[in-house]
Amino acid sequence: MQRRSFLKTSSVAALAASASVAGAQIVPPFKRQPRIAIGGIASECSSYSRIRARLENFSVLRGNDILTDERFTFLQRYDVPFLPTLVANAGSGGPIARDAYDALKTEYLGRLRALLPLDGVYLAMHGAMYVEGMTDAEGDWYEATRKVVGPDCILSASYDLHGNISQRIVDNLDAITAYRTAPHVDRVENTMRATDMLTHCLRYGIRPGIVWATIPVGLAGEQSSTEW
């Protein structure tokens, strides 16, 4: 595959702004039908909360229930099927109990292995997950995914604007997008940007990459709205 860096930026929000997608142009058919999995885990955690998110606090979609969920029905517009694994969401709350995270991760990886070999994986994430005893839960999820699918599989994820980035994440992901609005009215569009990049790269034989540079800037929540 041709190696090309799609994303050179300093924040997840800017990553989203620089995302390159296929758009509405007429595109050629795939040279061969790629195998693309979909999975993920999302939670917006406050590390100060004493209330732990347990397994029963997660809404978990498995198998074909993912494809029929309203958040992912747009996947039907692609000329390639997406292979479902597990998508878990705990919404906003306290830290995630380690045993809950480990259980979901183990099930996800088992479902992922059953689909091998894979050309791509789309990961529906949030970016602000905090798990007991871990400093980079998203990085752990991506690294575990990479170990299963191998170095040639393209991993693309979608994030919230304030999602956390680490070197571990950059080393294991190939593409990332984030909301461009706050409040978030572009949820579906954000997911589509991630899957558009993934399918575009597989169609044209492009291997995307992420370049990460930090900047010393912080914004309060009330200063980050795009609506006023």
Q: Model segments located where?
A:
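C-terminal segment of N-terminal export signals and the immediately downstream linker at the start
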Residues: 20-38
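Hard-cation-handling environments
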Residues: 223-228
